[in-house]
A protein has these predicted regions:
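Bacterial N-terminal signal peptides
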Residues: 7-16
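Carbohydrate-interacting regions of secretory-pathway proteins
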Residues: 21-198
Length: 198
């Protein structure tokens, strides 16, 4: 993985509900946006890193610096398949998500080649409590972030399906990656995305 492999500037969510759980911010209408990230710390989020107990932020992998959420492997001696995931403390099912991301830093020497300039958001996922200690990825549907490696087209926004399948227009899709029609972006460029999940 990258020593600092992607950075989130802001994460906003629009919900079709006004219900609240545990005093966390909620939208008052289906068109109101709420911030999932407070710009200060990881409040409202739970960390899960392969090989480490739920809630342990091994190596300070997920950190907030200057109001930006960063994913960093700076404190790792080696990657050793320690994939990191960050979960919101509230599960969502129907929502719109807006955020920005970019890649920075250099890949760790022992990380698998496929993780180069590769990250994403699990838009539907198994709960963090159900993930096994050494499980690399949650069973999920992932909106994949990719960046240009200088080897030709590498579009962002693919859908990946670790441990599951996808149905599109009534047809079962069993391939792991469903390619998007999005462009290829340079590695250090901020990319704005919006996802609608029904």
């Amino acid at each position: 993985m990258y020593r600092t492999y992607y950075i989130l500037a802001c994460i906003l969510l629009a919900l079709p509900t006004t219900t609240s759980a545990e005093g966390l911010p909620t939208a008052k209408s289906p068109h109101e946006w709420i911030s999932l990230f407070n710009g200060k710390d990881l409040s409202g989020w739970t960390v899960k890193i392969t090989g480490h107990p739920l809630g342990q932020n091994f190596g300070n992998t997920f950190r907030v610096e200057d109001g930006v959420l960063k994913v960093s492997y700076d404190d790792y001696k080696q990657f050793d398949n320690q994939y990191g995931h960050l979960y919101t403390d509230i599960a969502y099912s129907k929502y719109r998500l807006r955020m920005e991301y970019r890649f920075a830093g250099k890949m760790m020497p022992d990380a698998p080649k496929y993780v180069n300039l590769n990250s994403g958001i699990m838009i539907h996922s198994q709960s963090p409590q159900s993930i096994e200690l050494h499980q690399h990825f949650p069973v999920s549907l992932e909106f994949q972030f990719l960046a240009d490696e200088g080897k030709g087209r590498r579009q962002t926004g693919n859908v990946c399906t670790p441990g599951t399948n996808l149905e599109i227009d009534g047809k079962l899709i069993t391939q792991h990656i469903v390619k998007s029609s999005a462009p290829t972006f340079p590695a250090h460029e901020w990319v704005a995305i919006e996802i609608e999940v029904q």
